[in-house]
């Protein structure tokens, strides 16, 4: 391997490291972010049927996240689960028509009423997304 090849390998490694760091460390979903400051310890429970699963960016500058539209009685509720990369890491497979029970809190984000999930029960899975203090579990994976 000559010096030119070593330089290319070095630059590629640095760029890859910066890209991974930028996607996970400061994606707007972390504890202390503007978004997570919306989370309240006043936990409610929501149950219903998933109408739609989509990707959304809750606030400007955030990484994409997973969002559900859940029919709960006569209401349709927007539920924000977690960053997209976390759902991919967990191989999360939530589909329309799935029955769900979600614990979390109500919040207003960009003028829209949302439900920020802390625990999801669907099909045969129970997924804890935040601890008792509202700290996202994905912060432990960074």
Model-derived features: positions:
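N-terminal post-signal-peptidase region of extra-cytosolic proteins
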Residues: 51-55, 79-90
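Short boundary/loop segments of OB/S1/cold-shock single-stranded nucleic-acid-binding domains
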Residues: 24-45
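Structural detector for short beta-strands of small beta-barrel domains
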Residues: 42-62
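Short nucleic-acid-contacting surface segments enriched for D/E, G, S/T with interspersed K/R
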Residues: 86-102
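OB-fold (S1/OB) nucleic-acid-binding surfaces
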Residues: 59-81
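N-terminal signal peptide c-region/cleavage motif recognized by signal peptidases
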Residues: 17-19
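OB-fold/S1-family single-stranded nucleic acid-binding modules
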Residues: 107-136
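Bacterial N-terminal signal peptides that target proteins for export
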Residues: 1-10
């Amino acid at each position: 391997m000559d010096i030119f090849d070593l330089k290319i390998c070095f630059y590629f490694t640095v760029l890859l490291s910066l890209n991974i760091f930028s996607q996970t460390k400061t994606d707007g979903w972390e504890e202390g972010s503007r978004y997570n400051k919306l989370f309240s310890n006043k936990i409610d429970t929501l149950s219903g049927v998933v109408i739609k699963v989509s990707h959304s960016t809750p606030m400007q500058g955030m990484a994409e996240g997973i969002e559900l539209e859940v029919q709960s009685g006569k209401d349709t509720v927007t539920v924000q689960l977690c960053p997209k990369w976390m759902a991919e890491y967990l191989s999360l497979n939530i589909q329309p028509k799935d029955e769900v029970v979600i614990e979390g809190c109500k919040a207003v984000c960009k003028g829209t009423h949302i439900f920020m999930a802390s625990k999801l029960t669907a099909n045969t899975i129970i997924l804890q997304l935040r601890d008792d203090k509202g700290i996202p579990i994905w912060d432990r994976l960074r």
